[in-house]
């Protein structure tokens, strides 16, 4: 089976590497070999074996009947949305890790995939390697979900844990996270809560069967959390986590991303409450 990968950045190159390194195992599980025929990118990569597969014109991929699956790892809404929509319209299945795209246009793209009898898959957009999308789509379809709450961003969870355990301030912990590669040089998507917001929008849309625009969800990040906040939290035997939550209410849905104070786990019981750190 021939596939095309859209984007050859950190994620795209990782996809190609995994498919190459684990080729034998993947072939056994898939029942056939999966070959990367094209990689779409604006850049060239002289000296890299991938260069022979690089294309700059997306139409080449659309017009090739051998391409059955398009893997979109470009990030952002555009041009990813346009490219994914065209792939589905051309009868090609799409797999994406693009949480912003799924949160904004997921319902439309799922409907289009169903109409064209192909797949639009986005398990990697939420939870990394934790399977959550498929259970919501398949295993829990007969259940009525009342609430979803979780830690949806690993970077901020690492930072808050370090602030809690070491007493370090926000700036010091952010620099450490960046030095270790846990946080980007421009970390706004993580620390302002935007990443978690897009993820809770995706989960909410799937759980409750309606499109939820992440721009409508009130979102607060962790940039205002201080050492003093942790001192007060510890005095109450609480910790602080950035949580995304959504729940069904009588007049619709409630969704929020914000720091939340959570009672430290004792035995099997754990209680939480909304944080006053606004």
Residue ranges and their predicted role:
Residues 173-265:
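Substrate-binding/catalytic subdomain of NAD(P)-dependent oxidoreductase enzymes
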Residues 81-86, 99-127, 133-136:
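Rossmann-fold NAD(P)-binding glycine/threonine-rich loop
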Residues 94-95:
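A short hydrophobic/small-residue beta-strand
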Residues 75-77, 153, 260-262:
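Short glycine-rich anion-binding loops that position phosphate/pyrophosphate groups of nucleotides
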Residues 267-278:
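Positively charged, low-complexity/disordered segments
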Residues 1-89:
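N-terminal glycine-/serine-/threonine-rich beta1-alpha1-beta2 phosphate-ribose binding loop
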Residues 138-198:
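Conserved anion/nucleotide-ligand pocket segment
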């Amino acid at each position: 089976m021939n596939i095309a990968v859209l984007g050859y950045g950190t994620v795209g190159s990782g996809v190609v590497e995994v498919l190459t390194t684990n080729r034998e195992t993947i072939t056994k599980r898939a029942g056939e070999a999966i070959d990367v025929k094209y990689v779409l990118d604006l850049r060239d990569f002289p000296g890299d074996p991938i260069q022979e597969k690089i294309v700059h014109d997306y139409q080449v991929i659309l017009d090739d009947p051998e391409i059955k699956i398009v893997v979109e790892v470009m990030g952002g809404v555009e041009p990813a949305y346009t490219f994914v929509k065209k792939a589905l319209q051309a009868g090609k299945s799409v797999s994406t890790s693009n949480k912003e795209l799924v949160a904004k246009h997921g319902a439309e793209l799922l409907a289009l995939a169903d109409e064209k009898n192909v797949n639009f898959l986005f398990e990697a957009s939420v939870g990394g390697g934790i399977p959550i999308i498929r259970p919501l789509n398949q295993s829990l379809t007969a259940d009525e979900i009342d609430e979803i709450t979780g830690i949806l961003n690993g970077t901020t969870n690492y930072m808050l844990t370090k602030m809690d355990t070491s007493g370090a301030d926000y700036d010091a912990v952010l620099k450490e996270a960046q030095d270790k590669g846990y946080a980007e040089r421009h970390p706004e998507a993580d620390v302002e809560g935007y990443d978690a917001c897009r993820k809770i929008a995706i989960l909410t849309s799937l759980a409750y069967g309606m499109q939820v625009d992440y721009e409508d969800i009130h979102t607060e990040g962790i940039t205002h959390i201080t050492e003093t906040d942790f001192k007060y939290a510890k005095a109450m035997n609480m910790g602080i986590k950035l949580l995304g939550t959504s729940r069904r209410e009588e007049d619709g849905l409630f969704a929020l991303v914000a720091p939340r104070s959570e009672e430290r786990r004792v035995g099997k019981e754990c209680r939480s409450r909304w944080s006053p750190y606004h």
